[in-house]
């Protein structure tokens, strides 16, 4: 059933980065349920293809279009936006969800690990934002929306050393979203910018961060009832369903039992 306020987005196009699992997959599914055309991108698209088939079998009114894209490569990103332009006219909603964490501390971490996180969490997000805005501008889209899936780590620094550089990239996302809001205002457009900052969400995140210690990864999710990816997707739908004159700048959400 279409959510109140989502009718105006029906048949319009949303780009969701990092759509192969976790929050990205949940967001892509929720948007298809609301009748949108969704381009879901990731480095590997097998999971997105399966999700697209599930959405079709379920009879959802929208469509999920898998697209292979390495977000650490600017040429890949530009090619994706070019393909969206030629095949679907352009992007109306950009959801920068893709993120990367490496267990590289500030005192002994590898430069390559830092670069990997910065390239995906900051640069790719910024490139997608720029290209999405240009796509909207060239088609005179004045009601588009750019949503950055951030983290509570972008608002406070946790004590775990393996998350400190990642936290720095998420602080950057907080600043970039507010800077984007200001620039959109200066451009005299009604395109909106929103940051959604979840706390602990039960995904593969901890298993990728602690890939050498799956026991520690599992323990991350066992001590409290975590958020689900669908909870974050629900926040995305809420933001999109607000009237065009309403600017939701940031949603900070965490499990009820999470302390910080």
Swiss-Prot record:
Record keyword Endoplasmic reticulum present: no
Catalytically driven reaction(s): a 3beta-hydroxysteroid + NADP(+) = a 3-oxosteroid + NADPH + H(+); 17beta-estradiol + NAD(+) = estrone + NADH + H(+); 17beta-estradiol + NADP(+) = estrone + NADPH + H(+)
Annotated Gene Ontology cellular component terms: extracellular region
Keywords: Lipid metabolism, NADP, Nucleotide-binding, Oxidoreductase, Secreted, Signal, Steroid metabolism
Binding site for substrate: 151, 166
Lineage: Eukaryota, Metazoa, Chordata, Craniata, Vertebrata
GO molecular function: 17-beta-hydroxysteroid dehydrogenase (NADP+) activity; 3-beta-hydroxysteroid 3-dehydrogenase (NADP+) activity; estradiol 17-beta-dehydrogenase [NAD(P)+] activity; nucleotide binding
Gene assigned in the entry: Dhrs11
The protein, known as: Dehydrogenase/reductase SDR family member 11
Subunit description: Homotetramer.
Annotated InterPro entries: NAD(P)-bd_dom_sf, SDR_fam
Pathway in which this enzyme or protein is active: Steroid biosynthesis; estrogen biosynthesis
UniProt binding sites for NADP(+): 18-23, 43-44, 49, 70-71, 97, 166, 170, 201-204, 208
Activity regulation text: Inhibited by flavonoids including apigenin, luteolin, genistein, kaempferol and quercetin and also by carbenoxolone, zearalenone, glycyrrhetinic, curcumin and flufenamic acid.
Protein's organism: Mus musculus
GO BP of this protein: estrogen biosynthetic process
């Amino acid at each position: 059933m279409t959510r109140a306020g989502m009718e105006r987005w029906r048949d319009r196009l949303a780009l969701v980065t990092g759509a192969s699992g976790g929050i990205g997959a949940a967001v892509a599914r929720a948007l298809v349920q609301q009748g949108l055309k969704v381009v879901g991108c990731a480095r590997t698209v097998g999971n997105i293809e399966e999700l697209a088939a599930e959405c079709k079998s379920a009879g959802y009114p929208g469509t999920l279009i898998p697209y292979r894209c390495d977000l650490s490569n600017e040429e890949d990103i530009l090619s994706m936006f070019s393909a969206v332009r030629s095949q679907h006219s352009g992007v109306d909603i950009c959801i920068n969800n893709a993120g990367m964490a490496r267990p590289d501390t500030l005192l002994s971490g590898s430069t390559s690990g830092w670069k990997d996180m910065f390239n995906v969490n900051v640069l790719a997000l910024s490139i997608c934002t720029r290209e999405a805005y240009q796509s909207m501008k060239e088609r005179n889209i004045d009601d588009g929306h750019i949503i950055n899936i951030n983290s509570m780590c972008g608002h406070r620094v946790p004590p775990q050393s393996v998350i400190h550089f990642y936290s720095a990239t998420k602080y950057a996302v907080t600043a970039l979203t507010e800077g984007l809001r200001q620039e959109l205002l200066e451009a005299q457009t009604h395109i909106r910018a929103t940051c959604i900052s979840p706390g602990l969400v039960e995904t593969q995140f901890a298993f990728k961060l602690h890939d050498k210690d799956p026991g520690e990864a599992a323990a991350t999710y066992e001590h409290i009832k975590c958020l689900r990816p669908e909870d974050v997707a629900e926040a995305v739908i809420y933001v999109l369903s607000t009237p065009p004159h309403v600017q939701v700048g940031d949603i900070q959400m965490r499990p009820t039992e999470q302390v910080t």
